């Protein structure tokens, strides 16, 4: 089934070129199908890239999904064409009276800031509180996961001595969740973080389950079954060249950045990276849609 996105959204052209089944919102309205309603709070400066990555991993399921994109009103994005935001995004106030089947909150490049120093922190916590009643299931990514953990559970992020950067092996710790149904015991995931959450603090919260982690990269996937909240600290949705673009961007800015580990063939940044995480990414998002978003609705 298709992913329903605005007719002229740049992501649609990209996904159509990849033979990903998309459907424009105007065409979808002519069908008598109740699509799953998923709202995406996109906090990334690279909005087009991020919305494309998320649409791609949500598109390959038997379920029809309609995306609603929102951005913060308390902070005006500076790296995105204002016309793109006007045409394809809403603010929270414009959608707060609606009910959604799913919520996705992306990461954001504000990891090292204290929570209250983030311009949109108050707005974000309002959205998180709203989601308790207005959203069936939530998925939080990277900094979004850390922010939600702090808000709902009081667990603080910790700054790493150096950026954790590369493609790391992860291991399933708990198979009881349908989120990891069909996963291999060990799998690769792109990681790009300056901060982390400590496992011992998570284990102190009885309602949180650690589903997957890495001996090198730390926690990857947490699940709060009762509240239908999923916390994903890394980036299985990343494109083949995302870490490469981040590496070259930081080098051009003169920032301290090491070569992403386990990424370039022979650790040579002149070679094209090989994607070794795509199937895990697709399975995780498919499981989230099926078991956390759709099946509770159908009971």
Swiss-Prot record:
Q: Which UniProt keywords apply?
A: Acyltransferase, Amino-acid biosynthesis, Cytoplasm, Methionine biosynthesis, Transferase
Determine the domain of life of the protein's source.
Bacteria
Listed pathway(s): Amino-acid biosynthesis; L-methionine biosynthesis via de novo pathway; O-acetyl-L-homoserine from L-homoserine: step 1/1
GO biological process, any:
L-methionine biosynthetic process from homoserine via O-succinyl-L-homoserine and cystathionine
Main subcellular localisation: cytoplasm
- Tell me which residues this entry annotates as catalytic: 142, 235, 237
SUPFAM superfamilies xrefs: Class I glutamine amidotransferase-like
Query: Which InterPro entries has this protein been placed in?
Result: Class_I_gatase-like (IPR029062), HST_MetA (IPR005697), MetA_family (IPR033752)
Query: Which enzyme class, named as a word?
Result: transferase
Q: What is its EC number?
A: 2.3.1.31
Instruction: Enumerate the catalysed reactions.
Output: L-homoserine + acetyl-CoA = O-acetyl-L-homoserine + CoA
Residues the record annotates as the site (Important for substrate specificity) are: 192
Family stated for the protein in its record: Belongs to the MetA family.
Q: What is the documented function of this protein? A: Transfers an acetyl group from acetyl-CoA to L-homoserine, forming acetyl-L-homoserine.
Instruction: Return the protein name.
Output: Homoserine O-acetyltransferase
Source organism (scientific name): Synechococcus sp. (strain ATCC 27144 / PCC 6301 / SAUG 1402/1) (Anacystis nidulans)
């Amino acid at each position: 089934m298709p992913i329903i996105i605005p007719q002229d959204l740049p992501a649609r052209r990209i996904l159509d070129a990849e033979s990903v089944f998309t459907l424009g919102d105007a065409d979808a309205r002519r069908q008598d199908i109740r699509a799953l309603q998923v709202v995406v709070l996109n906090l990334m400066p690279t909005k087009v890239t991020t919305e494309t990555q998320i649409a791609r991993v949500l598109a390959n399921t038997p379920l029809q999904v309609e995306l609603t994109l929102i951005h913060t009103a308390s902070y005006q994005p500076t790296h995105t064409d204002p016309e793109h935001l006007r045409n394809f995004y809403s603010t929270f106030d414009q959608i707060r009276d609606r009910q959604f089947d799913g919520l996705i909150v992306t990461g954001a490049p504000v990891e090292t800031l204290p929570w209250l120093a983030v311009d949109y922190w108050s707005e974000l916590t309002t959205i998180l509180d709203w989601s308790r009643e207005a959203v069936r299931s939530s998925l939080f990514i990277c900094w979004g996961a850390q922010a939600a953990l702090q808000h709902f559970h009081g667990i603080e992020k910790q700054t790493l001595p150096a950026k954790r950067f590369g493609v790391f092996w992860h291991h399933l710790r708990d198979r009881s969740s349908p989120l990891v149904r069909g996963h291999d015991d060990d799998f690769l995931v792109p990681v790009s973080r300056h901060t982390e959450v400590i496992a011992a603090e998570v284990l102190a919260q009885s309602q949180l389950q650690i589903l997957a982690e890495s001996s090198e990269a730390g926690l990857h996937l947490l699940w709060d079954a009762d509240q239908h909240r999923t916390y994903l600290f890394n980036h299985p949705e990343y494109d083949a060249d995302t870490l490469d673009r981040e590496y070259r961007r930081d080098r051009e800015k003169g920032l301290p950045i090491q070569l992403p580990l386990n990424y370039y063939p022979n650790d040579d940044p002149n070679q094209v990276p090989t994607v070794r995480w795509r199937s895990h990414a697709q399975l995780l998002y498919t499981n989230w849609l099926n078991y956390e978003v759709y099946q509770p609705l159908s009971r």
